[in-house]
Amino acid sequence: MSIFAGKTLMITGGTGSFGNAVLNRFLRTDIGEIRIFSRDEKKQDDMRHEYQAKYPDVANKIKFFIGDVRNLQSCRNAMPGVDYIFHAAALKQVPSCEFFPMEAVKTNVIGTDNVLTAAIEAGVGAVICLSTDKAAYPINAMGITKAVEEKIAVAKSRYSGKTKICCTRYGNVMCSRGSVIPLWIEQIRNGNPVTLTEPKMTRFIMSLEEAVDLVLFAFEHGQNGDILVQKAPACTIQTQAEAVCELFGGKKEDIKVIGIRHGEKMYETLLTNEECAKAEDMGNFYRVPVSYTHLTLPTNSR
């Protein structure tokens, strides 16, 4: 972790599953400060007490900033002294975004623009934006807004000065807040049917640890404007549900199909065909480089 030695890292949306995974990975390293930026004071207070109990000797490295990525001045207020940013703040529930698409625009699109604008103004060293495989050939409001988030990050990278901007694109992060596996576990423990939307639906899956690994890979190896994607395995929703039943004592015959929810795709895609054509294979990851060709190209090539 020497690259983070004595540095200040800010995590937007930092009270979520990703922020917790980063704290557990970094707190006992030589990092200087981890700044949690989010709008929910109750979650911040819960996190403060949790980490004071869990890591009493290093919990003072965590600093909490109440603010909203939707507000540019709020982002600016949190920036002084920040060296790096992991931008995780997002609306990510597909059905909710379908019903309230402008709320998704405000957080995922305008919020990203605000974070990047404030970061560039403050001379932050690097910003890693967390995206989703739903941004590849998007069909729902969440995916569309995350696709625009990626476009904003790429566009900002062209004029970002000393600030490196990269995106990471995820599949489904298992056991993250709002994901289906915690719901299934709760259903099994309560003796209720295990509900799934469509047995043949496929999803790319990764762990929270892998989510942090991907961001660190982008931080260390990504170039300005890159999109970094992990080569995640895929499986059907039926297979996932049966595995959870086996692990937590549920019965496969109790699985109940409830139908596809608003905005959901049958099959996700990690990369578009166009991205595949230019992607660089980096072992466990793909790197999709940005094109810095200017809009004002000559009309002839004499």
Features from the language model and the residues they span:
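N-terminal Rossmann NAD(P)H-binding glycine-rich loop of SDR-like oxidoreductase domains
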Residues: T12-R25
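Conserved glycine-rich Rossmann-like NAD(P)H-binding loop of the short-chain dehydrogenase/reductase
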Residues: I31-K43
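Conserved residues in the N-terminal Rossmann fold of short-chain dehydrogenase/reductase
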Residues: S38, I66, K106
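Conserved Rossmann-fold cofactor-binding substructure of NAD(P)-dependent oxidoreductases
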Residues: K63-Y84
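Conserved Rossmann-fold NAD(P)-dependent oxidoreductase catalytic core, especially the SDR/UDP-sugar
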Residues: Y84-H87, L91-K151, A155
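NAD(P)-dependent short-chain dehydrogenase/reductase
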Residues: A141-G222, P233, I237, A241-F248
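Mid/C-terminal beta-alpha module of Rossmann-like enzyme folds, strongest
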Residues: H221-S291
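Conserved small/polar residues in nucleotide/adenosyl-binding loops
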Residues: T293-T299
